[in-house]
Amino acid sequence: MGLEEQLRLLPDRPGCYLFKDASGRIIYVGKARNLKNRVRQYFQSSRNLTAKVLAMVGQIVEIEHIVTDTETEALVLESNLIKKHKPKYNIRLRDDKHYPYLRLTLTEQWPRLVVARSMKKDGSRYFGPYTSSQAMWETMKLARRLFPLRTCNDPSRYPRGCLQYHIGRCLGPCLPDFDRHREYAEAVRDLQAFLEGRTQEVLERLRARMEQAAERLEFERAAELRDQIRAIEKVTEKQKIIAHTMVDLDVIAYARLYDEAGVQVFFVRQGKLVGRDQFLMSGADEMTGGEILAAFIQQHYSQTDFVPKEILVSEDLPDADVIAEWLSAKRGSRVALRCPKRGEKRALVEMVAQNAQEAMTERRQQRELELAATEGVLRELQAYLDLPRLPHRIECFDVSHVQGAEVVASMVVFEGGRPKKSDYRRFKMKVDQNNDFANMAEAVGRRFRRGLAERAAQVEGRVRDLEEGRVAEGGAEYGGKFADFPDLLIIDGGKGQLSYARAVMRELGVDHIPTFGLAKENELLCTEDRPDWIELPRGSQALFLLQRIRDEAHRFAITYHRKLHRRASTHSRLDDVPGIGPKRKKALLQHFGSLKAIREASVEEVAQVPGITLELAERVKEALGGPMR
């Protein structure tokens, strides 16, 4: 079906649209109040489209759409689809999956505060993400000092109380005669409020409890509460007052750097600045400031539980009313989303914007220093090895096995002196398991055969683009990771491995790529063009870079080899039976206890296991042997 026909079939309804290229990959996800009108705008006139959007439109061959009941639902769906598919042309939060959270385990009998690497829908309360692990651990340390919740995984292991209990940092739910259930529940509630920045609320509750304890003549308990109040007051005294009303709000501003945007968020709770975070957004080139902030708000607040009553932004947002409606639904009460133009709040926004600009300036300077240092190392390496061009892309191959078993090879890639892990590849050897030289040749051959095939696909894609009137740039999308050839190829090994690798490269017509062997024993390099070994100066940055690349290839190969070895060590004859997957295998072993018991059972007895038909039972018995009846 052609694009014109696909456009004609779009409904006049709210929803999300997904643009796909010729390979079926989703390259952009968007939302719309009216799908037909919004999507048609991309194809009606190119005058108002940026170069980036034009390039994207030139690659679209299929349009998929999902209808929703409201525009707010479309906004939520768009955020989820972007996170799932990571489309090339959408602006996205970078590396959010690496940011840690603090997790309050509310579903456990005795909740505790722990570190989590991702959010799950498990009934826990998550705080974060924390872009600084140091800030996260400082918050954890403070919370554990102020609120005496358990820190152990299994309270039953400490019937006499753990160390934290004996030093007054835990109420001791592990004790058999523990009777402070109410106090523990109050500590959990206070910790949650404290981490949300509602310290004044916590202090008011603690003061009320202290007075009640004193009235009941529980002076020891009153003293504990007094000390807790003083500790919290000491912490909050250090927090800067930036609003003269007891208000909870987030203040968000951004600054640009190349195709990135740095978004700065200041967290104000009850009028005091309790923290700030810096986030990076990729794909921000040609996006307006409002579009950057809107994308950030959607993605950031979809990952966090707490939404403040008010959010201030440095620029007006597109679809601000829809975003505010979504935030309000998430919070459970009205959220004000504002771009202040004057007054105290405008000054606050400008202060955050200034911080964002300073952070990105620092990032630019750091990047320039790193680039200058890296280019110097690469030029040094180019001179030592007499390379025709700067080795921007370096690939390294390593083979790993134990006595010829589970032979694997790895290919690691460094670009600009840094690992490019998205281009790493692993190969399970298929030919000669006991010949290191042949294994290296197989890995190198498979890499370049795939690369040549992808380059051919690129050419075909460009020709098809030109014939169909699409943007020629789109042809590049038909290739894969192997289509980029290295400026320098390193073989982990000596002249034998190098010779076999070069032979297969000549056969494929890629022997123009400079290739060197790097011996482990003495860190010497060899190449076909020189009879003698090449020794780089000890302590040189060029040698250090090659060692780092070689060690990374070895690590990557060893990791894969161990994975295969573990899989082989847990392999059973049941794994070879068609129709028996992990669940049915588990059911059989749980029912009979061992393979021997299954072998001795009859077909009818095996068929009594849930999920096992009579036909499957016969297959199992044929594979394992033993009596059929």
From Swiss-Prot:
InterPro entries: GIY-YIG_endonuc, GIY-YIG_endonuc_sf, GIY-YIG_UvrC_Cho, Hlx-hairpin-Hlx_DNA-bd_motif, RuvA_2-like, UVR_dom, UVR_dom_sf, UvrABC_protein_C. GO terms for biological process: nucleotide-excision repair; SOS response. Pfam families: GIY-YIG (PF01541), HHH_5 (PF14520), UVR (PF02151), UvrC_RNaseH (PF22920), UvrC_RNaseH_dom (PF08459). Residues 12-91 form the GIY-YIG domain. Residues 200-235 form the UVR domain. The keyword Protease does not apply. Keywords: Cytoplasm, DNA damage, DNA excision, DNA repair, Excision nuclease, SOS response. GO terms for molecular function: DNA binding; excinuclease ABC activity. The UvrABC repair system catalyzes the recognition and processing of DNA lesions. UvrC both incises the 5' and 3' sides of the lesion. The N-terminal half is responsible for the 3' incision and the C-terminal half is responsible for the 5' incision. Interacts with UvrB in an incision complex. Belongs to the UvrC family. This is UvrABC system protein C.
